[in-house]
Regions:
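Short, strongly hydrophobic transmembrane alpha-helices
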Residues: 1-17
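Hydrophobic, regular-secondary-structure patches
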Residues: 15-87, 94-97, 111-112, 129
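Generic signal for short, ordered secondary-structure residues
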Residues: 5, 74-75, 158
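Hydrophobic secondary-structure segments that place a key small or acidic residue at a functional site
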Residues: 69, 81-178
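Arginine/glycine-rich "motif VI" loop of SF2 helicases in the C-terminal RecA-like domain
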Residues: 4, 27-28, 142
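Amphipathic, positively biased hydrophobic alpha-helical segments used for protein targeting
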Residues: 11, 15, 26-28, 117, ...
Length: 178
């Protein structure tokens, strides 16, 4: 009986330790975030304001929210060069913190950028290096008929410089309201 009780205690202890270890690992990877995709199908629709309302109604569950609107149909252009594989997202001032992005240069998007529909953006490292020789802050990038002033450059996310086109380092983030 004593051996059986000890075995159960050891098994429960190992299980609890493994659970904590897995939670810590997931938290370090940023998996304490939730992504909700809203598609234009069906009779129900949602807006960015709905997302903010849900966060206000559930402050104990949601610490921060940010919309991520896919604008990738707008192919970025710098001079005569088109960046066909770049992703373009409309986000708010919380997005960089939620994704654990750090800045290499400049600043993140700010509340006033969103409120005032400013034509500014933050770019990934790949675009900064290939389009601007590492000096993108203050330059402009064209999306459709609009020009956006680059206010920040993200630190590299991908360690292999040969594998950067079409990934996190090849993104452009602009105010979702623009």
């Amino acid at each position: 009986i004593i051996i059986g009780v000890m075995a159960v205690i050891v098994i429960v202890g190992l299980g609890n330790g493994m659970t904590k270890s897995m939670r810590d690992s997931f938290s370090a990877m940023g998996t304490n975030t939730l992504s909700i995709s809203i598609w234009g199908y069906g009779s129900r629709s949602a807006s960015v304001e709905d997302v903010y309302d849900i966060a206000k109604e559930n402050p104990d569950l949601l610490k921060a929210v940010s919309p991520q609107i896919d604008f990738s149909s707008n192919t970025p252009k710098v001079g005569t060069t088109t960046y066909r594989y770049s992703y373009v997202y409309g986000v708010d001032e919380n997005y960089s913190a939620l994704k654990n992005y750090t800045l290499a240069k400049g600043r993140s998007l700010q509340y006033m950028d969103i409120k005032d529909n400013k034509q500014v953006c933050v770019i990934g490292d790949f675009i900064n290096r290939t389009a601007f020789g590492g000096n993108g802050v203050g330059q402009t990038i064209k999306l459709g008929a609009y020009k956006f002033r680059i206010v920040g450059v993200l630190s590299p996310k991908i360690s292999d410089p040969t594998m950067q086109e079409g990934n996190d380092d090849d993104c452009i983030y602009l105010p979702y309201s623009t």
